[in-house]
Swiss-Prot record:
Catalytic activity: (2E,6E)-farnesyl diphosphate + H2O = (1E,4S,5E,7R)-germacra-1(10),5-dien-11-ol + diphosphate; (1E,4S,5E,7R)-germacra-1(10),5-dien-11-ol + H2O = (-)-geosmin + acetone; (2E,6E)-farnesyl diphosphate = (-)-germacrene D + diphosphate
CDD domains, sorted: Terpene_cyclase_nonplant_C1
Binding-site positions, Mg(2+): D86, E91, N267, T271, Q276, D455, N598, S602, E606
Source species: Streptomyces coelicolor (strain ATCC BAA-471 / A3(2) / M145)
Gene responsible for this protein: cyc2
Source taxonomy: Bacteria, Bacillati, Actinomycetota, Actinomycetes, Kitasatosporales
Cofactor note: Magnesium. Fe(2+) or Cu(2+) ions are very less efficient as cofactors.
Family: Belongs to the terpene synthase family.
Spans annotated as Germacradienol/germacrene D synthase: 2-354
Official protein name in the record: Germacradienol/geosmin synthase
Cofactor(s) needed: Mg(2+)
EC number: 4.2.3.22, 4.2.3.75, 4.1.99.16
Pathway where this protein functions: Secondary metabolite biosynthesis; geosmin biosynthesis; Sesquiterpene biosynthesis; germacradienol biosynthesis; germacradienol from farnesyl diphosphate: step 1/1; Sesquiterpene biosynthesis; germacrene D biosynthesis; germacrene D from farnesyl diphosphate: step 1/1
Note: The earthy odorant geosmin is also responsible for the 'off-flavor' of contaminated drinking water, wines, and other foodstuffs.
Protein role: Tow-domain protein where the N-terminal domain catalyzes the cyclization of farnesyl diphosphate (FPP) to a 85:15 mixture of the sesquiterpene alcohol germacradienol and the sesquiterpene hydrocarbon germacrene D. The C-terminal domain partially converts the germacradienol formed into geosmin, the characteristic odoriferous ('earthy aroma') constituent of Streptomyces species.
Motif (DDXXD motif 1) on chain: 86-91
């Protein structure tokens, strides 16, 4: 290779890499095993020399340093299998663009991961099936049914990405920085690798496996693995192979900076993700363990798993430093007094740990709120879909005003009549569902009022008091206001509870308990996300862009409104269609577009008048160290990319989903209607932001911000209140 395009930056390495002493055993075993499975000579994919050059034994010995010999051999076999699968799929299906054969191949693989031991397996037809059958049989006896289910799903997702890659069109475009980080997470194998970390260390208890803190651990783990790889592989991928999916190239292109500056910035992002990992491990994981009532042994299991992910990070770095596959010479030198030598001193890099990393970590906590920023700048926002409004709009406005007064929303010191009118939530609802009847529009307006009021209430009432405990109590009680099957409902103690009980009864009257469940989860996710925002507010912690975007979808209440859209679809569309990658991609593109749109319009309101830190423009400013115009450019581009992604999924990916799931014409009609619903949703939200006073500079300048005079917010109601049956 030619001269390196940049010097490697100082890496944040708080944990030394360690090598498993059973390395040679794993190397020898994996070679024998691969030959027995038919992966080597005669496979048309690998020879033994290929396997030896890859040296997956060394990778696994570094990333799983503490497990015993048989466990390391099994884990190494899993990595041999997954890399062989990838190369096998490339040779057999990608090169020939044979979708039908590729899909048939993928459809059989779940048959070799039965959740029930008695289910049996078909006879393997190729080395991929033979390897999976053998590995599953050797692995699952030691693990619980919950782990089997999670690992089977993670494996299916990892394999199915090959199918979507085969179907997608390579647009030849360098991604937006925030979009890129999220994209790498989607196509990576982090949940799969994390499952094997559980096998090597300790299984995560089912009670917390699906919680946000454990998800964040896995996602920050994933981001750090991918960004580290981008730094080491830039020269090979970008200069030698012409690859566009590299984080250094993404930042270099988008910010117009030098390659060295982009590499340093990628390392800042990598360091931030590791800080997020540590922050979650030290603050959110203990809290959720306490909340879920984990036993000491279960807490120890979560700790061992967390340490296992840290070991994977350290070992993965050491692997990159030693592999001939990567650019790994010339890390930027330290000052003489800082340069330590000897075994294990990479983790004692004083410069990295006490200078750059500390300054970078502090950036998230040193933001000064209530800065004067002036009116929000509204850039060119692309909207290809026409606006339609429900003719029931005027009636909904009158009804919402009366309903809010009845519920007590206008008498708690957060909203008054003027503030409600400035929101004009029926205008938003009328655009979201232009075909709505009067009753439907009244109900939709009520849901928007509940969500918007709660979003204002939590930071104002609990944030100023720094009272996270009271906020958690409120969140728990709100969940209790949504019974699935006749459970007792607490007597309402404030306007939020009163309005939610009313909305729940009116919305779910004709639903079964199973139909109510996703709606309840959507509301729970939204109120839990308000707690996340509140926790950051109390700590004065500006989140990083990826974590922010993930949580913003929940705080915006998007799943709630989309769930109401889907509720009338009936059984024609199977649930797995909604869970498919393209449909989730479609929904997330629309959701992100709307959330970012809100942040652009609300920038002055939130930053200058409310001291808010949860705004995408501010998050990008803080994270990348750029000014308002540059950050606004990133957010504007991300919005427009999300719209293009939405259009791409509709045109190219949904037809493939319809065929893959063999949907009936009725189901296809329902899905086309759902796409129209999403188009109306985006057009209606843009129209609402453009026309309501809530975000306009002249309205903001004339308002009282904070608690309204003469109105006292209702205190939280004790948990022990007698219940009512509703």
């Amino acid at each position: 290779m030619t001269q390196q395009p940049f010097q490697l930056p100082h890496f944040y390495l708080p944990h030394p890499a360690r090598l498993n002493p059973h390395l040679d055993e794993a190397r020898a075993h994996s070679t024998t095993w691969a030959r027995e499975m038919g992966m080597l000579e005669g496979s048309g994919v690998w020879e033994q020399s290929d396997l030896e050059a890859h040296d997956y034994g060394l990778l696994c010995a570094y990333t799983h340093p503490d497990c015993d010999g048989p466990a390391l051999s099994l884990i190494t076999d899993w990595y041999v299998w997954v890399f062989f699968f990838d190369d096998h799929f490339l040779e057999k299906y990608k090169r020939s663009q044979d979708r039908l054969a590729g899909k048939a191949h993928l459809d059989r693989l779940p048959l070799f991961m039965p959740l029930d031991d008695a289910a049996g397996m078909p006879e393997p037809r190729n080395p991929v099936e033979a390897g999976l059958a053998d590995l599953w049989t050797r692995t699952v006896p030691a693990m619980s049914a919950d782990w089997r289910r999670r690992f089977a799903v993670a494996t299916e997702h990892l394999l199915n990405e090959s199918m979507w890659e085969l179907s997608n069109i390579n647009e030849g475009r360098v991604a937006n920085p925030v979009e890129y980080i999220e994209m790498r997470r989607k196509v990576g194998g982090a949940p799969w690798s994390a499952g094997l970390v559980e096998y090597a260390t300790a299984e995560v208890p089912a009670a917390v496996a699906g919680t946000r803190p454990l998800r964040v651990l896995m996602e920050t783990f994933s981001d750090a693995v991918h960004l580290r790889n981008d730094l080491f592989s830039y020269q090979r991928e970008v200069e030698d192979e012409g690859e566009l999916s590299n984080g250094v190239l993404v930042l270099e292109t988008f910010f117009g900076c030098t390659t060295q500056e982009a590499a340093d910035l990628v390392n800042d992002v990598l360091t931030s993700r590791l800080h997020q990992f540590e922050h979650t491990a030290f603050t959110e994981v203990p809290a959720v363990a306490l909340e879920k009532g984990l036993t000491p042994l279960e807490v120890a299991a979560v700790g061992a798993y967390t340490k296992g992910l840290q070991d994977w990070q350290s070992g993965g770095h050491e692997w990159h430093m030693r592999s001939s596959r990567y650019m790994n010479k010339g890390e930027r030198p330290l000052a003489g007094w800082q340069a330590l030598t000897g075994p294990g001193t990479s983790a004692a890099d004083v410069g990295a740990l006490l200078a750059d990393a500390v300054a970078q970590r502090a950036r998230s906590y040193t933001y000064v709120p209530f800065q004067k920023v002036g009116p929000s700048v509204i850039p060119d926002i692309r909207m290809p879909y026409p606006l339609e409004l429900s003719p029931a709009l005027d009636g909904a406005r009158r009804h919402l005003s009366e309903w809010c007064r009845e519920m007590g929303i206008l008498s708690e010191g957060v909203w008054d009549e003027d503030k409600l009118e400035s929101c004009d939530l029926p205008l938003c609802a009328a655009g979201l569902d232009p075909d709505a009847t009067q009753d439907q529009l009244d109900l939709a307006s009520g849901w928007l009022a509940f969500g918007t009021y709660g979003d204002d209430y939590y930071p104002l009432v609990y944030g100023h008091r720094r009272d996270l405990a009271a906020a958690r109590l409120t969140t728990t009680r709100l969940s209790d206001c949504m019974p699935l099957d006749g459970e007792p409902v607490p007597p309402p103690g404030n306007a939020m509870e009163r309005s939610l009980i009313d909305l729940w009864v009116r919305t779910t009257a004709g639903m079964t308990p199973e139909e109510r469940r996703p709606l309840k989860k959507a509301v729970d996710d939204m109120t839990e996300a308000w707690l996340w925002e509140l926790s950051n507010q109390i700590q004065n912690r500006v989140p990083d862009p990826v974590d922010y975007l993930e949580m913003r979808r929940a705080t915006f209440g998007s799943d709630l409104t989309l769930g109401l859209c889907r509720a009338g679809h009936g059984p024609a569309v199977p649930p797995e269609v909604y869970r498919s990658g393209p449909v989730r991609s479609l929904e997330n593109a629309a959701i992100d577009y709307a959330c970012l749109l809100n942040d652009v319009f609300s920038y002055q309101k939130e930053i200058e008048y409310e001291g808010e830190i949860h705004n995408a423009v501010l998050v990008v400013q803080n994270f990348f160290g750029v000014d308002y115009p540059a950050a606004l450019g990133v957010v504007q581009d991300l919005m427009n990319q999300r719209m293009r992604q939405f259009e791409h999924v509709v045109a190219h990916e949904l037809p493939v989903v319809y065929d893959d799931f063999q949907l009936s014409e009725e189901a296809r009609t329902v899905m086309r209607g759902y796409v129209t619903d999403l188009q109306n949703w985006m057009a209606g939200i843009l129209n609402w932001h453009r026309n309501v006073p809530r975000y306009k500079a002249e309205y903001l300048a004339g308002r009282t911000h904070g608690f309204l005079p003469d109105r006292i917010p209702a205190p939280p109601v004790p948990r022990s209140s007698p219940a009512l049956t509703h």
